[in-house]
Structure formats: C-alpha cells, structure tokens
C-alpha cells in the first residue's frame, strides 16, 4: 500500500507513535521484515490473510513515549541516517527524514534487539503473531527462557565471587541467546572453564557472573525467593542446566525437561538424608542420579520336553495297557515335580502359564487313556479285532452285544454246573450204598 501522507507543516515535530498507524511497507515480501531479520518470529503462513483483514487503527489522541525510542539503541541509530543531518536526533525533521528514520527503525538490527527481544516492550505485546492464539507459542518460550536465565543467574550469584572478564562473556552470550536461539548454541560457555574443579571436591567452584545480571529478567529475585521458601522444592532443578542455557523452546523438549525434573525428585526421595547435601552441589554433568543396584534374577530350568501327542498311537500289543498307564503317569508326575523344583520368585503370568501347561498335559493324558481303552475294547470283540478304523460308536454297540451274549452264555453254563453238581451228589450217594452192601 503506497504512503499517502500529506503534512501542512514540513517541520512539524511528531512522535513515532502518532505517524506509525499510517505507515505500511511498499512490497509484500517486506511486510514481516522485522520478524524475518530477527529470526525469532518466523513469518506466519497466512500473510495475505493478515493483510486482507487488517483494519487501519485510529491514531492516538496524544503522542506516547515508547521505552524503545528513548533507549540507547534509538540514540545509536539516529546518527547513522543516510542524509547525514546535523541535528543528531534532537531537532525537527522533515517528512522525508522521518520516513527514513522509520525505515531505519524497522530495518535496524540494534533496534530489533530492544523492540523484539524484550518481552516487556509494547511492540512485542502488540505484535500480530503474539496476539494470535495459534502463533503465541513464542511467548511461552520467551517466558521459559526468562525463568531459566533467572534461575541460572541466581545460581551463579550464590556459587562464588564475580569475575569481570568471564561475566562480560556471559552477558554477551545471554544477549545473543535472546537475539537468536540457533546462534547462541555455538557461543555457550565451556563447562570446564566455568567448573574447573572435580565433582568430588567439597568446595564450590568460583563461577562467573556480571554485576548487572539481574537485568536479564525482572523476576529473578522473586523466583529465587520462591524456590528457597517452598518446602517441597528440590535443589535439583537449579542444577539441571547450569553450564549452558537451553538451546531450544519446543514443546517436546519442555516435556523432556519436566520428566527429567520429576525423575530427579523421585530419586532424591529415595536417597538417604546424608546424601542430599551432596546432591545439592552443582556438577558439570547437570543431572545427579545414584547408581541403581542391579537386579539379581534367578533362573531355573523348566523342562520343555513334550512328546508328540498328535501322532497316531500304536495299536501293537508290545506291553499291556496297565503298564502303559503306569509309564505315562510317572512321566507326567516327573514333569510336575520338575516345575515345582523351581524356587525363584515368579510373577502371576508365569504361574498362570505353568498351570495352563500342566492342565494341557493332564488333558492330553486323559484323552490318550480313553483312546487306548477303546482300542483295548475293540481288540476284545471278535468281529472288530482286526478292524483298526472302527469308529467308537460301532465299538460300543458291538461291545454291548458281545457282553449280552457272554452273559447269556454264562447263565447257561451256571445252570449246567448246577445240574452237574446234583448229578455228582447222586453218584456219591449211590457209591456209598454199594460199599455198604459189599461189606
């Protein structure tokens, strides 16, 4: 959208806020120039939609003074005007000079640090992407960064005396970290430089901090006091990342940090009271976890040798059926005894599997015994003696008929036996009579 602004007075002194609502960039790709240069706020995928539905705000009634315009960065930018005015930023400007000044404000890297990187600034709050609920994740990330830096600087204050040279490097690194998250990862402090002492040393190592380190976050003292006054607070969260600030602000790594903190708290509860003082000391590794005692698992040999019960049983008369039953029962009892000899503690699943296995073995044994009984009954029937494929129903019917015929024959034989006994008695009595007559 072209700039259509007309001023009656060329030397009219206006503040940036009174003219800002009328300014728009000429080209579409420069609409998010401030966000593209800082790389902290990537351009939204719906730039055209934002421009289409953007309403022109009304100018304020009275010009307000921004903290960014009064900051040293604003004063540092004004002498770099291409016009080379001798005003030095203190006199009246023409319309062209004001336009160039606004362009430099939008494109200057030094001003971007004060306008964009400061979460408390009004420009940061009035940003389009910050106001959108879908793209407001950066606000939470900046809040997390400020909290981490506050705890980081508070821990550095308590750990030792300040060192000016190292404090300057820490300040520069932290400011660069606020400016660019990806660039700060390569400029972090070496842990060996900050903590030159070993882990087992009782004395705390001297760490570097700057005199004005509290300027990074206004809530550093409040965070430190809340951490010390909380009865449930653990000394471990301050020790998690002392040597370097976090290098990412994604949700997945925030969840990982939360899980690690919970893990540290749970481990600290298991430790003895004497070891808690040692766990509170800072270390180069960050996380302090006690060595876990190895679990001693005793294993026992479970007999898995099983016969192939699915194979067709042999009908040969090698040994009697009673001997077969005895051998099978001995084999099953031996398997059960081998399972009971295992003295190691098992879970409920292992016990259930053993019970199921034992039940399956006993069920197979019962079926095999029933099958052998049918085969033995078939061998006793004369009609089915040589028929190995006789069904069980035929075997039962033939066996019933055979039993009835045997019972009828038995009754006949019993009656014959009675007749023969009577005949014998008669013959004995007649023999006695003959002996008496001869005598």
Curated annotation (Swiss-Prot):
Phosphoserine: residues carrying this PTM: 6, 62, 71, 81, 151, 159, 161, 293, 314, 329, 344, 347-348
Chief place of localization: nucleus
Motif 9aaTAD in this chain: 100-108
Cross-link (Glycyl lysine isopeptide (Lys-Gly) (interchain with G-Cter in SUMO2)): 52, 143, 148, 298
Start-end of Basic and acidic residues biased regions: 266-278
PROSITE patterns: BHLH
Residue(s) carrying Phosphothreonine: 8, 58, 315
Region of interest (Disordered), ranges: 206-294, 335-360
Swiss-Prot/TrEMBL keywords: Acetylation, Activator, Chromosome, Cytoplasm, DNA-binding, Glycoprotein, Isopeptide bond, Nucleus, Phosphoprotein, Proto-oncogene, Transcription, Transcription regulation, Ubl conjugation
Record's comment on post-translational modification: Phosphorylated by PRKDC. Phosphorylation at Ser-329 by PIM2 leads to the stabilization of MYC. Phosphorylation at Ser-62 by CDK2 prevents Ras-induced senescence. Phosphorylated at Ser-62 by DYRK2; this primes the protein for subsequent phosphorylation by GSK3B at Thr-58. Phosphorylation at Thr-58 and Ser-62 by GSK3 is required for ubiquitination and degradation by the proteasome. Dephosphorylation at multiple sites by the PNUTS-PP1 complex promotes MYC stability by preventing ubiquitination by the SCF(FBXW7) complex.
Biased composition annotated in UniProt, kind: Low complexity: 207-237
Protein name listed in UniProt: Myc proto-oncogene protein
Native source species: Pongo pygmaeus (Bornean orangutan)
Lineage of origin: Eukaryota, Metazoa, Chordata, Craniata, Vertebrata
């Amino acid at each position: 959208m072209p700039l259509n602004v007309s001023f009656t007075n060329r030397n009219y002194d206006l503040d940036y806020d009174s003219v800002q609502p009328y300014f728009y960039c000429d080209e579409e790709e420069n609409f998010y120039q401030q966000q593209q240069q800082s790389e902290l706020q990537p351009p939204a995928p719906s730039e055209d939609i934002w421009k289409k539905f953007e309403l022109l705000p009304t100018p304020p009634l009275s010009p307000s003074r921004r903290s960014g315009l009064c900051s040293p960065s604003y004063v540092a930018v004004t002498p770099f005007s291409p016009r080379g005015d001798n005003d030095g930023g203190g006199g009246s400007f023409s319309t062209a000079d004001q336009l160039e000044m606004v362009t430099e404000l939008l494109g200057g890297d030094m001003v971007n640090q004060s306008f964009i990187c400061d979460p408390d600034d009004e420009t940061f709050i009035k940003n389009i992407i910050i106001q959108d609920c879908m793209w407001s994740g950066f606000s939470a990330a900046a809040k997390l960064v400020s909290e981490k830096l506050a705890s980081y600087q508070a821990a550095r204050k308590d750990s030792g005396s300040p060192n000016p040279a190292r404090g300057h490097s820490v300040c520069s690194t932290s400011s660069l970290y606020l400016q660019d998250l990806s660039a700060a990862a390569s400029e972090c402090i070496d842990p060996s430089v900050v903590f030159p002492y070993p882990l087992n040393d009782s004395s705390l190592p001297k760490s570097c901090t700057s005199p004005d380190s509290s300027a990074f976050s206004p809530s550093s003292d409040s965070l430190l006091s809340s951490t010390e006054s909380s009865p449930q607070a653990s000394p471990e969260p301050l020790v998690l990342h002392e040597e370097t600030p976090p290098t990412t602000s994604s949700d997945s790594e925030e969840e990982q940090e939360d899980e690690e903190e919970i893990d540290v708290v749970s481990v600290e509860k298991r430790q003895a009271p004497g070891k808690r003082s040692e766990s509170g000391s800072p270390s180069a590794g960050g996380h302090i976890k006690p060595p876990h005692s190895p679990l001693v698992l005793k294993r026992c040999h479970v007999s898995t040798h099983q016969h192939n019960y699915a194979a067709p049983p042999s009908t040969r008369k090698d040994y009697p059926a009673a001997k077969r039953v005895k051998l099978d029962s001995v084999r099953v009892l031996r398997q059960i005894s081998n399972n009971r000899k295992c003295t190691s503690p098992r879970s409920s699943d292992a016990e259930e599997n053993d019970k199921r296995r034992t039940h399956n073995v006993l069920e197979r044994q019962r079926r095999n015994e029933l099958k052998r009984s049918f085969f033995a009954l078939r061998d006793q029937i004369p009609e089915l003696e040589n028929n190995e494929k006789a069904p069980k129903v035929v075997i039962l019917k033939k066996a019933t008929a055979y039993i009835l015929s045997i019972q009828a024959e038995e009754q006949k034989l019993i009656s014959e036996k009675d007749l023969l006994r009577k005949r014998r008695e008669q013959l004995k009595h007649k023999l006695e009579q003959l002996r008496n007559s001869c005598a």
